[in-house]
Amino acid sequence: MSLGLVGRKVGMTRIFAEDGATIPVTVLDMSSNRVTQIKTAETDGYNAVQVTYGSKKASRVNKADAGHFAKAGVEAGLGLAEFALSADALSNFKPGDAIAVEIFTVGQLVDVTGTSKGKGFSGVIKRHNFSSNRASHGNSRSHNTPGSIGQAQDPGRVFPGKRMAGQYGNVKSTVQCLEIVRVDAERQLILVKGAVPGAKNGDVVVRPSVKAGA
């Protein structure tokens, strides 16, 4: 249970370490994070802080969201995210509070969640890393097919979860234990080592790494 930030993926670039080594980094814009709601165990059944970021035209905000943001006294944002916190940590926040990138430090490990790029309808070889069937020697029309998808009359059905062709990508995805290389407090940017899911300008959520003991 720890606080994170919501933002967008700007893109990838590289920076140079003091020894001249090249470090590939992803630039994340974490500006304008603000608290929209405090959820407590008494009223909501769990403790969490709800956060939004960015800005949205008033004409693009529905009445339910407009009322929600107005109640918090904040400008309408692009989306909402929640971070579970302890009751003690929750007491440090109130609706309207700003959250800056300074909650993270250089060298800290974080988990970054985004929506992966959609690849359209794909076969099992591309989607699930299946192997191709034989190129010849008795095989004439089944080179890239998945093969058998079941057994016989018993059980007489395809089991749920069977890996088959279908939509590839465009799903929520998390990359764990990415190292923060730089924190730009002036521009509210975070530079993490490596790649994160999604296309440019896609929404991302950054949390302290679970595996690092956060």
Curated annotation (Swiss-Prot):
Residues 130-151 have a biased composition (Polar residues). The modification N5-methylglutamine is found at residue 153. The keyword S-adenosyl-L-methionine does not apply. This is Large ribosomal subunit protein uL3. GO terms for cellular component: cytosolic large ribosomal subunit. It comes from Chromobacterium violaceum (strain ATCC 12472 / DSM 30191 / JCM 1249 / CCUG 213 / NBRC 12614 / NCIMB 9131 / NCTC 9757 / MK). Belongs to the universal ribosomal protein uL3 family. The keyword Protease does not apply. It comes from the Bacteria. Part of the 50S ribosomal subunit. Forms a cluster with proteins L14 and L19. Keywords: Methylation, Ribonucleoprotein, Ribosomal protein, RNA-binding, rRNA-binding. Methylated by PrmB. One of the primary rRNA binding proteins, it binds directly near the 3'-end of the 23S rRNA, where it nucleates assembly of the 50S subunit. Pfam families: Ribosomal_L3. Residues 130-163 are annotated as: Disordered. Signal peptide: none annotated.
